[in-house]
A protein has these predicted regions:
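A conserved, hydrophobic alpha-helical segment in the catalytic core
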Residues: 114, 218-231, 270-273, 306-349, ...
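Residue-level signal for inorganic ion chemistry
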Residues: 150, 203, 215, 227, ...
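Short, polar loop motifs at secondary-structure junctions
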Residues: 264-268, 285-288, 426-431, 468
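Flexible active-site lid/hinge loop adjacent to a nucleotide/diphosphate
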Residues: 181, 186-275, 313, 391-410
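Extended acidic/charged loop-beta regions that coordinate divalent cations
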Residues: 39-63, 84, 94-100, 185-187, ...
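Membrane-proximal helical linkers
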Residues: 119-143, 185
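ATP-dependent carboxylate-amine ligase
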Residues: 1-102, 108-125, 277, 331-338, ...
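Walker A (P-loop) phosphate-binding motif
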Residues: 133-180, 467, 472
């Protein structure tokens, strides 16, 4: 009976555990950190076995209650388990461990025991990933058109998304969503017949030193765009100098025929001493390619010469900055200006990046994918223009822990000046922000919980930096 209870509890626990592991991007360390923060779950499991030994079959009732509770916890997860091929392979590896666990009745240690099959799974997945990476590298070598690599501490996905629209005439293939790792880019290249495309636009992300070098060594772009540098992922990079070195490594392998496109509105890039042999093009308010934002139009200049203008449909400096790499390449590719103007005036934003949704007489600004101060302040400025009750839902920021006090001083100041109410999603790092908020505010467990509290009666709601369950 004890082994049966153990098996049932293990099976009911499994969806929750595997989902958290998936949200941790299959990193065992992040997975363990989550459950160490939520260790009360394991204590409940232990309680079942203590009651069993004391009262025998009466523990079935308690086991049933725990089972229901575990399934309830899974139902409360905002991001549910996605049954990918990797997850299916993982479940196959887990089968013998479930049997061993039920036989030995060690559910109390189940979370930690699962690290063994996770480790085995990761070894297998590395072999599989290496196979598909080699396949993608071969396809890249056979591709005879431009490969554009986009990196930076922020705005990579938006810049890529804008660029693919501006350059539509040359039929580019852009990696979808935020696919910016070796596996993500390999998946995109392997899923498409590259003979139908005349350019590749590859977003290249980096959370650790040498991530960019691995990407450029595999897909060797001949055009590199750096959107900006800031204190992101400081927990892994340690200091801003390492971030600059990492991001700028994208231009190291370009060669004499390569093109490096840098955002000179960014202080770190503007002050960077470039000693490479590639052709350098800067963009910004005062750069090789510059812009002038007027009330009705945006003027574009190349080396102080007027190029064209397009209608300003509510664009601000960050929007135009994110458009500039696409505009530069459009000019270099000699795309018809009228076509570029039409696309710029009708450009679409990527999902969850300041998308505006209307619900009755209320609006929601969905900026849930943003995770940096600059973008958050921009979204607050957008919120300011609505003559409605202004509400922000935010957890703050989940990285740059050393800089959080300074970041939150600036963030809270604008929230207090602009908003009428703030819902703070409770994280381990959110108390600093919570204490700095002077307007009416309250804690919530998730963005979804805050949504349920909205009246949608003449409200303007900003959802800023939603986070997965792994951070909660």
């Amino acid at each position: 009976m004890l082994s049966f209870i153990s098996l049932v509890l293990s099976l009911s626990y499994l969806p929750l555990i595997i989902t958290i592991y998936q949200q941790a991007h299959y990193h065992i360390k992040e997975y363990l950190n989550y459950f160490i923060r939520h260790f009360y779950l394991e204590l409940l499991i232990l309680m079942v076995y203590l009651i069993y030994f004391i009262s025998g079959y009466n523990s079935l009732i308690m086991a049933f209650l725990i089972l229901v509770y575990l399934l309830y916890l899974y139902s409360k997860l905002r991001i549910k388990l996605k049954f990918t091929k990797r997850i299916i392979r993982l479940f196959i590896i887990l089968i013998p461990f479930l049997y061993i666990n039920s036989y030995l009745c060690i559910s109390y240690l189940f979370i930690f025991i699962l690290c063994i099959p996770f480790f085995i799974s990761n070894l297998i997945e590395r072999k599989i990933s290496h196979y598909y990476l080699k396949k993608a590298i071969l396809k890249r070598k056979e591709f005879n058109h431009d490969v554009i690599g986009i990196t930076g501490s922020f705005a990579k996905t938006t810049t890529k998304y804008f660029m693919s629209q501006i350059l539509d005439d040359i039929t580019p293939l852009a990696t979808k969503a935020s696919y910016n790792t070796l596996n993500g880019i390999s998946l995109e290249l392997n899923n498409h017949n590259l003979k139908y495309y005349n350019a590749l636009i590859l977003e290249m992300g980096s959370n650790h030193i040498n991530d960019i070098k691995k990407l450029t060594s595999a897909f060797f772009p001949n055009i590199a765009v750096v959107t900006g540098i800031g204190p992101m992922h400081l927990d892994s990079f340690k200091n801003i100098s390492n971030i600059i070195k990492e991001k700028m490594s994208i231009i190291d392998g370009l060669g004499e025929k390569g093109i490096a496109i840098l955002n000179y509105d960014n202080e770190y890039l503007r002050n960077y001493s470039y000693n490479g042999t590639s052709y350098l093009i800067s963009y910004g308010k005062n750069a090789d390619f510059s812009y002038q934002i007027l009330e009705d139009y945006v003027n574009i200049y190349a080396y102080n010469e007027f190029v064209f203008k397009f209608k300003n449909n509510g664009y601000d400096e960050i929007d135009i900055s994110n458009m500039m790499p696409g505009i530069i390449l459009g000019v270099l590719y000699k795309i018809d200006y009228n076509q570029m103007i039409f696309r710029l005036e009708n450009i679409k934003r990527p999902a969850s990046r300041q998308r505006i949704l209307e619900i009755g007489n209320s609006i929601i600004i969905d900026d849930s994918f943003n995770s940096n101060l600059k973008g958050a302040l921009k979204a607050l400025e957008q919120l300011k223009h609505y003559n409605k009750k202004k509400i922000i839902i935010t957890p703050g920021f989940v990285e740059c822990k050393k800089l959080l006090p300074n970041l939150y001083l600036k963030y809270a100041k604008r929230i207090n000046e602009i908003c009428d109410y703030a819902y703070i999603v409770k994280l381990s790092t959110s108390k600093i922000l919570y204490d700095l908020i002077k307007i009416n505010h309250s804690y919530v467990r998730s963005v979804d919980e805050a949504r349920l509290m909205l009246s949608f009666n003449n409200e303007a709601v900003l959802i800023e930096n939603d986070v997965p369950d792994i951070y909660l």
